Amino acid sequence: MSPTSLNTSSETAPPSSTTVCVTGAAGFIGSWLVMRLLERGYTVRATVRDPGNMKKVKHLIELPKADTNLTLWKADMTVEGSFDEAIQGCEGVFHLATSMEFDSVDPENEVIKPTIDGMLNIIKSCVQAKTVKKFIFTTSGGTVNVEEHQKPVYDETDSSDMDFINSKKMTGWMYFVSKILAEKAGMEAAKENNIDFISIIPPLVVGPFIMPTFPPSLITALSPITGNEAHYSIIKQCQYVHLDDLCEGHIFLFEYPKAEGRYICSSHDATIYDIAKLITENWPEYHIPDEFEGIDKDIPVVSFSSKKMIGMGFIFKYTLEDMVRGAIDTCREKGMLPYSTKNNKGDEKEPILNSLENNYNIQDKELFPISEEKHINGQENALLSNTQDKELLPTSEEKRVNGLESALLSKIQDKEVLPTSGVKHAKGQENALLPDIANDHTDGRI
């Protein structure tokens, strides 16, 4: 599906004066959401950690209508008041940025507390603006189904088991906790200040993308192709949504007059064997395992119910095949995935992880297999579904387009950030929040 193809699940175009803020705007979800908002005629204020880093914002300023409807603002979730100017005059805020440090030695102070404080700081900016009517928080499936025993179906009334998370401390446990507590704190603060708070809960997000680096969620989704066995347990029993459907869901909920509370945005459920079959049938050039060690072929699916959104009139447009095709096509076009993992005899080539590391611009160690000792019941799917907006995989240096830098300078609104000589980092800003995994934070968001 072409990145410029418009899903029309929400029919009413916004008034030309509608201004919204998107945090974590450079990431996997954030950048696609910005694109769709611009297409709808919104005026978008996109917050990023470093507006002067052309490599990280070029895909935003090159979007259609960016020259008239998009401005970039320097903001840091850890700095109170950092979002004041960007949010001033906005009717809505889409909060996608989050703090993510899986290897943190002090998760309480490096992940959990910054995420909660960041949420409250942004809510304070909304209150100060006096114009914000809706606050949409992109959370994680990890707030719904992280528990010892999986149920067949989950909905918005379900909540992850904090005692289980704290006792097991599985991979990404601090991310789950941070999202759970930030959602609770945000809901309470928004209610106290008469701001409609909407929490949108996505599963594993898959599809084409415009960000310049490899989205972490696709590391998981495409693991049967790459042979990244550490991620097999994540998609053992997984839920999926197309990136475009998710972003249209954000806009739909913003435009829906009475939307408030939690909403699951998930369109498909599948086991790892379903995914393996889909890839084998459509891309026979890839070597896909017939069996996955330790995973029963008859394992049941676990579903996330989107009945609430569908009942409001939202329509999911994409199939599971559309999601995988969009992801594969984009990764191929960007040189991030080979066109085949078989040799002329039909046998498997050199392990693709080595090939990717050496030849396909994927340099970050986090792409490759991690220890399996902490994988519990496949719960990491909820985590990596939203590591949708972490800059894990830097690509090779891109050629700069003539005049691009000057175009950027004219579009950045923080006068302290960009004097004519270039980007002037405010004192202490270098330690700003990691740019939603997928996050804008870890998935490429800044």
Swiss-Prot record:
Catalytic function, reaction form: a (2R,3S,4S)-leucoanthocyanidin + NADP(+) = a (2R,3R)-dihydroflavonol + NADPH + H(+); (2S)-flavan-4-ol + NADP(+) = (2S)-flavanone + NADPH + H(+)
Enzyme Commission number: 1.1.1.219, 1.1.1.234
CDD domains: FR_SDR_e
Spans annotated as Disordered: 421-446
Enzyme class: oxidoreductase
InterPro entries noted in UniProt: Epimerase_deHydtase (IPR001509), NAD(P)-bd_dom_sf (IPR036291), NAD(P)_dehydrat-like (IPR050425)
Signal peptide (UniProt feature, chain positions): none
One GO BP: anthocyanin-containing compound biosynthetic process
Keywords: Flavonoid biosynthesis, NADP, Oxidoreductase
One Gene Ontology molecular-function label: flavanone 4-reductase activity
Binding annotation for NADP(+): K56, Y175
Pfam families xref list: Epimerase (PF01370)
Functional pathway: Pigment biosynthesis; anthocyanin biosynthesis
Family stated for the protein in its record: Belongs to the NAD(P)-dependent epimerase/dehydratase family. Dihydroflavonol-4-reductase subfamily.
PANTHER family, per the entry: NAD DEPENDENT EPIMERASE/DEHYDRATASE, STEROL-4-ALPHA-CARBOXYLATE 3-DEHYDROGENASE, DECARBOXYLATING
Record function comment: Bifunctional enzyme involved in flavonoid metabolism.
Protein name stated in the entry: Dihydroflavonol 4-reductase
